[in-house]
Amino acid sequence: MTITPLNPTSTQQPDSLGRFGKFGGKYVPETLMPALLQLETACKKYSQDPTFKQELQQLLRDYVGRPSPLYFAERLTAHYTKPDGTGPQIYLKREDLNHTGAHKINNALGQALLAQRMGKQRIIAETGAGQHGVATATVCARFGLKCVIYMGIHDMERQALNVFRMRLMGAEVRPVEAGTGTLKDATSEAIRDWVTNVETTHYILGSVAGPHPYPMMVRDFHAVIGVETRAQCLEKWNGLPDILMACVGGGSNAMGLFHEFINDPSVRMIGVEAAGKGVDTNKHAATLTLGRVGVLHGAMSYLLQDEEGQIIEPHSISAGLDYPGVGPEHSFLKDSGRVEYYSVTDNEAVAAFQRLSQLEGIIPALETAHAIAYLETLCPQLSGSPRIVFNCSGRGDKDVQTVGKFLEG
């Protein structure tokens, strides 16, 4: 088996201050600046280091199971075929088949290798759906690193399976009761820990959020998704996809897919957020749809906030999308018009969760189901037979109980 090289063709980077336009930056306590500078230096050094790249590629192949397949969803395609025989050809980038069941392992693995080279033996991370926590616990077990995971108490209840998996692999899972006990609160606690233990500890942030260099670094570790997708599309039909789709919470799986194609104007890109109980309610997580610019967790981006600038607590049936911010590069791509962002409700996501399960025998993560759900709106608008690739970012074993309770009423 050959492994796809990890060199994305897109040249877009943040500037020297870590900004994408006006978004991004480093809004952090002074105590964290040395750690961020050390991390930035390590990123620059090892991204060009042949030994590091070879080790990462070998682990992605032999441990993670890359490349992940690009699967033609025949029955889902038939579901959206019009009476005249036209309709989109739908392909799934199967990140759910990675070791640990989601895209999160790509980034966790890369950061663990960096942490080793920086001499950090203690790892902390935040998690919402539990997939990033599981991926982090996995790589810490693989490399013999001490692991502490911060997780909101509410998320621990709805993602009990992943909590057990993390503890099984030797991680300490610390419940966070502050706020609503969800992803934002877990992230805040992880940052507090990092400030206190910065000399010995590396923070494996799980999304393209946070202060520079995290949005760039996490994107680049996930860019293998888009690099593989380009090669697989060229192999299958000797061309590029017409449309890319991915769910967006913090936005790491979407950036991993989109980044490779940013400079291909023929490729339309769509990110799908969580509308929760509806964007006309206060129970949603549609940051790019309804948010305003502010600073959270070390970066400037779109945020859900009230008139006084206080963060509004988000809501989504999906723990991984239940976040009041978004990665700064997504904010930049929204304002530049390069990527379109829409939102779907809990009800629509659950219907899509069932639809993919019944039509393809693939149970998607609830996060992924949001992207699938937008096909209901998108497909009737399309003419001809465009090729759609959507990122099947994770598997849905973790969400079966949540969906069961939701359907019971």
Swiss-Prot record:
Disulfide bonds: none annotated. Its EC number is 4.2.1.20. The modification N6-(pyridoxal phosphate)lysine is found at residue 104. Pathway: Amino-acid biosynthesis; L-tryptophan biosynthesis; L-tryptophan from chorismate: step 5/5. It catalyses: (1S,2R)-1-C-(indol-3-yl)glycerol 3-phosphate + L-serine = D-glyceraldehyde 3-phosphate + L-tryptophan + H2O. Pfam families: PALP. It comes from the Bacteria. Its cofactor is pyridoxal 5'-phosphate. The beta subunit is responsible for the synthesis of L-tryptophan from indole and L-serine. Belongs to the TrpB family. This is Tryptophan synthase beta chain. It comes from Trichodesmium erythraeum (strain IMS101).
